[in-house]
Amino acid sequence: MQVRIVATTPFTDQKPGTSGLRKRVSAFRQAHYLENFVQAIFDTVTVPENATLVLGGDGRFYNREAVQIILKMAAANGFGRVLVGKGGILSTPAASCVIRKHRTHGGIILSASHNPGGPDGDFGIKYNTANGGPAPEKITDAIYAASKNIAQYRIAEAGDVALDTLGDSQLGDMVVSVIDPVADYAELMESLFDFGAIRALLNSGFRIKFDAMHAVTGPYAREIFINRLAAPSTHHPDVGANSFALTCDGRMNSPLHPADSVMNAEPLPDFGGGHPDPNLTYAHELVEILYGDNAPDFGAASDGDGDRNMILGKHFFVTPSDSLAILAANAHLVPGYQKGLAGIARSMPTSMAADRVAKALGIPCYETPTGWKFFGNLMDAGKVTLCGEESFGTGSDHVREKDGLWAVLFWLNILAVRKQSVETVVREHWARFGRNVYSRHDYEGIPTEAANGVMQLLKGSFASLQGAQFGHLQVKLCDDFSYTDPVDGSVSNGQGIRILFVDGSRIVFRLSGTGTEGATLRIYLESFEPDTSKHHLDAQEALTTLTSIALRISELRQRTGRDKPTVIT
């Protein structure tokens, strides 16, 4: 094998965000751009001789090309073996599962998660460590530092690897193992949940609809829901984990036909022109079905790379914050969690509903910055079992990523045992613990300067806001959230502005770290309602006062010209 050493110069914009490096496809297709970042990873992470790497992505545009480049670079940088998903496909939680099961040195995941795909869309890359989780900040900071000083990269001169055939092939001295991307993950799910009970539920007339949003979870959903759980399908039941392969343009060479229980199951490089973000705005097709006539009993969706989830009942939406709390309160009903929970962790903007469950269970609840990487240390140290973010991410210590299908199966297991509707489960939870009324307002694509101006204004107002009275609400504390990791003592500053009120209400302002164009300003609103007679109120109606305060103190409309959010969750 001939190794080519290519001279290069640094790019200045390769600082990883919350979930790796995300840019427009056009940026990644620049000469040397992807190669520079991959070499920065390999230069930062000490690679033992003959180490094994996991590689795969969500199937978006440029995925296959990137996989081939990384395979050749891995061979040139001394890896002994790469486990790559068939067709270059691996959902993010499945990649974490494979890293952990096969005890590899780590993995490279190609995804921009919920961001749009296609030639004019987004692309992303991140490195996961040997525990299966996203690289912590000390590693991503080192990768960024390496990217700013890179002078050359190493790449093998070799032909492309056949990604659509399972089995081993040789790339120089390195073995490339094309693996079934679904099998290990599906087996893990079957070890955690009572598939027999869920199968009985689905055979009882209980109807589900899962929207894969033309993203990576389609093959996983078909294998688990159709093949293993016998959910109704209009498609041949044998099509599942071992039968799909992507052609050069990323389309399935054995098309998946519309199914009763799984919709939009065919992964497409542009996600069918949609925005693979499972929320009430972008998953509108599913929402219309669940809120329509003759609606199914249960609905769910996942995102581009399979790590997020949205849960719906018949004419009913479950907020991600409530979902985390409800899973924790009902974990004893699920085989994989019957021995109890060590603790719960939530991101700071996520509602405090989980805190109330943790208190009732007598276990700790940790508040971390946004980003799944902050949960990794807590899970590795055995401090927490369940974790969640308000941004439709829920998971546990079974892997080190949030996991969309895992959350869906957890809900189905609970419903199978309790034999109640989604709405009844949620309302009984509120009756027991009280309702944390919660909403997130996203202002997407704001000019970065204007968004930064809003945040600077708020930071400069801390002194005047302290103790301020807004009608019946009085400010108790305002700060820029800082987190000290209880495991390794590392400190993360500047994680979001909190306005805390005496009665427990909160307003949080945060700039998102996952977009690629402009800035996304998120406003999180939360109040606690113990009165069951008010639990029926619409969240936006109940949060009107907090919304007005947020807009007033941030001068958001004046500074951005936006008169309403892009997305309300």
Locate predicted features.
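Glycine-rich phosphate/diphosphate-binding loops that line cofactor/substrate pockets in enzymes
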Residues: V38-L53, F195-N203
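Phosphate-binding and adjacent anionic-ligand microenvironments
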Residues: P296-F298, S302-G304, I311-K314, P335-S527, ...
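N-terminal small/polar loop signature for handling phosphorylated ligands or for N-terminal nucleophile
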Residues: Q39, T52-G121, E223-I311
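Positively charged, low-complexity intrinsically disordered leader regions
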Residues: M1-V38
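Gly/Ser/Thr-enriched, mixed-charge loops and adjacent short helices
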Residues: Q2-F11, H32, P119-G240, C248-G292
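Short glycine-rich or small-residue beta-strand-to-loop segments that form or flank ligand, phosphate
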Residues: R24, A51-D58, K126-N128, R207-F210, ...
